[in-house]
Amino acid sequence: MSSVDILVPDLPESVADATVATWHKKPGDAVVRDEVLVEIETDKVVLEVPASADGILDAVLEDEGTTVTSRQILGRLREGNSAGKETSAKSEEKASTPAQRQQASLEEQNNDALSPAIRRLLAEHNLDASAIKGTGVGGRLTREDVEKHLAKAPAKESAPAAAAPAAQPALAARSEKRVPMTRLRKRVAERLLEAKNSTAMLTTFNEVNMKPIMDLRKQYGEAFEKRHGIRLGFMSFYVKAVVEALKRYPEVNASIDGDDVVYHNYFDVSMAVSTPRGLVTPVLRDVDTLGMADIEKKIKELAVKGRDGKLTVEDLTGGNFTITNGGVFGSLMSTPIINPPQSAILGMHAIKDRPMAVNGQVEILPMMYLALSYDHRLIDGRESVGFLVTIKELLEDPTRLLLDV
């Protein structure tokens, strides 16, 4: 049998090193070609390292938590046909009847097919994948399956607690758990602190009447979905309005590099997305060339990749301006933090019915607060306020987005 080195994938120039996150096999385990052996976590994404051939994991040279660099040897794989024999032997030990062997085989395949996000969710809650029924393709576990299982667990535990007399927990029962920060969380912490300490950040606010967009979605939403196969959401309107405002105020689409101001003549917009690993900002590129349907599809694609831990370094690199939507979590108002080296970030919030004065009359309208945080070293009040007013005007008259007026 020949021995094959298991190597760290080539890391982009912007990524200096990585951390061994999870070994899915231990020495002596049989593996098949393209089966995920180990996950490598960078500042931005989790990279899966698959087996290059059938065989047996011969050695693990870098343990979980170790910092590694590009092309470093992680372990060794011994090629051979014994993988099939060992897998068969394990299945025979687990199941004595054909039906049991078939079930064991299915469970083993489904567990191997778990996405990094699902594995991490199971590990965080100390759950056994085999104890949860999967509803995905081929019986695979989905995030919804795990969340439903978690939702049921407290209900079962709360019944006897309700019947028992209330008792104060003993002081000895108080505990703490200390866990190391993930590379992503550490990187997020570093960048947020960098933004606060290295920019002259200021936030300006405005509010927008969302009724015109809501009426437009109500009137054309069904036809839009039938035509394009995607729901007409709010984000495509936000992105379109941002691009038009960036064209009118190029300082907001610029960045500072040393003593120079770099003006970008392209429009790559970062979208703040919450994932099981933390907050990431994948990039929509050349959004000025995209239609509403294309924007909605791109946003959905990036959101799904983020949820499943499939975002690549390329997905997260670049971006000239960021949009964050705290409204999906119920946020009414916030002061978003700039995403360096960008110079501004737009915060969208929850849409709430509020009484507003319209032509001397009080009307109940669906209103949303807008927040623009910007680097005052580059962007002055005229540009920041004008930028935000432009977005307000475009959202309150969405036909202007389509007519480019």
UniProtKB/Swiss-Prot annotation:
It holds the Pfam family Biotin_lipoyl. Residues 97-111 have a biased composition (Polar residues). One of its GO terms (molecular function) is lipoic acid binding. Its EC number is 2.3.1.61. Residues 113-150 form the Peripheral subunit-binding (PSBD) domain. Pathway: Amino-acid degradation; L-lysine degradation via saccharopine pathway; glutaryl-CoA from L-lysine: step 6/6. Residues 75-111, 153-178 are annotated as: Disordered. One of its GO terms (cellular component) is cytosol. The modification N6-acetyllysine is found at K148. Binds 1 lipoyl cofactor covalently. It comes from the Bacteria. It is an enzyme of class 2 (transferase). PROSITE patterns: BIOTINYL_LIPOYL (PS50968), LIPOYL (PS00189), PSBD (PS51826). Its cofactor is (R)-lipoate. Residues 153-173 have a biased composition (Low complexity). Residues 3-78 form the Lipoyl-binding domain. The active site is at H376, D380. Belongs to the 2-oxoacid dehydrogenase family. E2 component of the 2-oxoglutarate dehydrogenase (OGDH) complex which catalyzes the second step in the conversion of 2-oxoglutarate to succinyl-CoA and CO(2). This is Dihydrolipoyllysine-residue succinyltransferase component of 2-oxoglutarate dehydrogenase complex. It comes from Escherichia coli (strain K12). The lineage of its organism: Bacteria, Pseudomonadati, Pseudomonadota, Gammaproteobacteria, Enterobacterales.
